[in-house]
Structures are given as C-alpha cells and as structure tokens.
Design a protein with these regions (language model features):
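N-terminal alpha-helical targeting/anchoring segments
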Residues: 2-136, 151, 155
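TRNA-recognition modules of translation machinery and tRNA-sensing kinases, especially anticodon-binding
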Residues: 29, 132-431
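Short, Lys/Arg-enriched, disordered terminal segments
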Residues: 1-3, 430-431
Length: 431
C-alpha cells in the first residue's frame, strides 16, 4: 500500500529525495534513509530464514537414519537443533512482519515522483498560468454578488440552510435549481458524445478505498466518516470510480477505460480556507460530473491533455471564458504526477477562480488498490489513472451567472442548455 515501489527507492534514493525537496517536504527526507535501512534488514531476514529452513530440512532428514542405526543420543541432539532453528525462524518471521509494516507506513507518505514539466513552487500562489480561452470581458454595468443575482430569481435560501445544516449548505430553488441540474445533464451528454461511459457510483466507500485513492493528509481535511461504520461520504466520484477496480486484473485490450460519473460530493473543507464567505463558493456539499480514465502508462500524458481540453470546450460552449493553471510542485497532492486547474473568469471580481482540476496520478492509485493490467505478453503491470472535473455546480454557477448576465437583470441561456431548460432563452428576474 504505497505510492512508489520500494525497488525504485532502493535504486534511486537521490531522485526520491530531490522530489521531496521539490515539494518542500524536507521533514520527510530522513524517512528515505530509514525505509532503506528497514528494506535492507527485511532482505537480510528473508535470506537468513531461507538458509535456516534449508539447513533444518537437511538435518531433520538425518534423524530417521540415526535412529535406524540405534544412535539415539545423536538423534536427540539433532532434534534439539531442529527445534532451536524452528524457534529462531519464528522470531525472525515476527520481526519480518514488523519491518514490513513499518516500511508500508513510510511508503504511504513518500510522495509520488512529479513530472519533469511541473513548475517548482511552494504553494498555490506559485501556480503558473498556461493558456487563456475566450476574452475575459468586463461589462459596462455593475454585476451584483452571485447570491444577489440568485435572489432576484427567488433562487437561493442560505438562511434556511444555515438553520437546518449550518454554514456551507444552501437551498437552490426555481429557475436557479433547474439551471444547476440542466448544466449537469448537459455535461453528462457532452461527455457521452465524446465516447465516455456514463456511470452513477456509490456515494459512500470503505476506509481501504479511501486510503487507496488519497493521502492521509487529504483524507483528514476532506472526508466525513459515518459514525460506527466503515463508511465515508465521497468527496468526489473519482473515489468510488477508481475504487471500482480494486484488486482487479484488466485485459490490456480493454484499455483505455473512459468513464464519466455523476455524484453529490461532500467535503469537510478543514484547513487553510475553511468556509467563511457567504454564498456557494466554498461549501460542504455540491454535485459533480467527473471524468475518470484507466489506461496504459505510455498513454496517460495523452489522456491528461484530452481531459482538461474537454472541460475547456464545455465552458466555452456556455460562453464562459477560462484559463488553465499549471499546479506547481508544492501544491500537488502527494499521489499526483501532474495537475492543471481550469479556472473560470469572474467579471465581477475581475479575476479567474477554480472550477475544475485535472490530474494524472501515474500508477500511485493503481499500486495502492492493486489495479493491474494483463499485457499481451502475459506480463502484468500497474495501470495509470487520471481524473478531471467536467463541471461542479453550484460553484460554477457564479461564473455562469456573471458571464451571462444582461444589463436589465435577465440571464441569457446559451443555446446548448435550452433543451434542458424547457426551451427558455433567458431567465427573467422576479424582482
């Protein structure tokens, strides 16, 4: 259960250490030396056990012969030797278990090797803009705060939600609720048209799946646990979609698996940001259309580019300008090889904000969950996994409403969404 192969660490300790430095996690450097010592001990134990077993088998064969020759005392001597090496083997095996447990623990926190193209930086403030799509226009009229736009359509009730569930929840109503669902339905069909298989997965998963798809640090800040049960609410359908392939061997000719899943998502949002602002920007519950790919290692970078481009195309089809942002080394979660955020333009704030994230996890999740491929030559190898947001309202409704708002307070419905909105071409405010 780890991100890297111990063999890789053994053969490339400096690469592993430099990668840790690049991620500004220097407190983990000593773990590399520690795990290599444990690995050495583990291999020595294995050799010793093997030698003892061979020796024991050899001498136990003498017992019968000695008894047959009436050499009883000598036979007893040999029996004692056999018993002693049996005890020693047991001691060694117990230690071996301990050592392997410790190795596993350390390997769980040694980060995956990032792609050489990833910019080096401490945190998300050092992410690098890659490309812009669509003109980030600021209109010549005042754009209200997103909840005020929603309220003009009687579309949101945050006060009632706070009474019922606390901060970070919302009631969406009327046209705004319908818009929320329409965008998800459109996103689903958009991905089906691009050849992805639609899937509705479990919205809760066991702890072993949680450990397989994310680092412990991520789990602590995101996941809600169901009291008294081995169940967690998913933070994204990626969790249950990757979990679907736990302990499996996929025939190579079945690859790539290209899936698009829908689910509600639940997040504690513990940590740096918390939930401070009024509205639907940072919330405990949202809905998401997701894409997940399981593919051959040599194809994962090609799929990575295809995935984020899908999101860009989708947002552009709804008249929302976007940009891509390369995540720097310090901002990358420990399992990720490379990641890009898709950000939508907010004409009200005159800046871009995150609406999706595309990641290549290399074989990190596959290693933890044992997702293997049966190659043409009969050799088994680990698959690569990727995930990307198609769309995750209600946060992206902020960008949708701001970019499609007109001076008279109406909101234009882009053509692609009209069939999901009962043919409406625009939303007209109630007050």
């Amino acid at each position: 259960n780890k991100m890297l192969d111990i063999k890789f660490v053994r053969e490339n300790p400096e690469v592993v250490k430099q990668n840790i430095r690049n991620k500004f996690q220097d407190n983990k450097l000593e773990l590399v030396d520690k795990v290599l010592e444990l690995d050495k001990e583990n291999r020595e134990i294995k050799q010793e056990v093997e030698a003892l077993r061979a020796e024991r088998n050899k001498i136990s064969k003498q017992i019968g012969a000695l008894m047959g020759q009436g050499k009883k005392e000598e036979a007893e001597e040999v029996k004692k030797q056999v018993a002693a090496s049996g005890t020693r083997i047991e001691e060694l095996s117990a230690r071996e278990k301990e050592v392997e447990e410790e190795i596993k623990k350390i390997m769980m926190v040694i980060p995956n090797i990032i792609d050489p193209s990833v910019p080096i930086g401490k945190d998300d403030s050092e992410n690098v803009e890659a490309e812009r799509f669509g003109e980030p226009v600021v209109p010549d009229f005042e754009i209200p705060y997103h909840t005020d736009i929603m309220e003009s359509f009687d579309g949101i009730d945050l006060d009632a939600a706070r009474e019922v569930a606390g901060n970070g929840f919302y009631y969406l109503m009327g046209d705004i609720a319908r818009l929320h669902s329409a965008i998800l339905s459109y996103a689903r069909d958009f991905m089906i048209d691009r050849g992805f298989t639609y899937c509705v997965p479990p919205f809760m998963i066991h702890g072993n799946v949680v450990n397989g798809v994310m680092s412990f640090a991520e789990m602590e800040s995101m996941m809600y646990k169901i009291e008294g049960e081995d169940l967690y609410l998913i933070g994204t359908s990626e969790h249950s979609m990757i979990g679907k392939f736990i302990d499996s061997i996929i025939p190579e000719e079945k690859l790539p698996l290209t899936l698009t899943s829908y689910s509600p998502c639940f997040r504690k949002e513990k940590g740096a940001h918390g939930i401070e602002e009024r509205g639907v920007y940072r919330i405990h519950q949202f809905e998401k259309q997701e894409m997940v790919v399981v593919c051959k290692p040599e194809d994962s970078m090609m799929w990575y580019d295809k995935l984020w481009k899908n999101t860009v195309d989708l947002f552009r089809s709804m008249d929302i300008p976007v940009r891509t942002l390369e995540c720097c080394s310090g901002d990358l979660a420990d399992l990720k090889v490379k990641s890009v955020d898709v950000e939508a333009w907010s004409p009200r704030q005159k800046k871009y904000f995150e609406v999706g994230s595309c990641s290549n996890l290399g074989d990190a999740q596959a290693r933890r969950l044992k997702i293997r491929v049966n190659g043409e030559d009969g050799k088994k190898y680990l698959a690569h996994t990727l995930n990307n947001t198609v769309v995750a309202p209600p946060r992206m409704l902020i960008a949708f409403l701001e970019n499609n708002l007109n001076a008279d307070g109406t909101v234009s419905i882009p053509e692609v969404l009209r069939m999901y909105m009962g043919g409406k071409e625009k939303l007209v405010p109630k007050h």
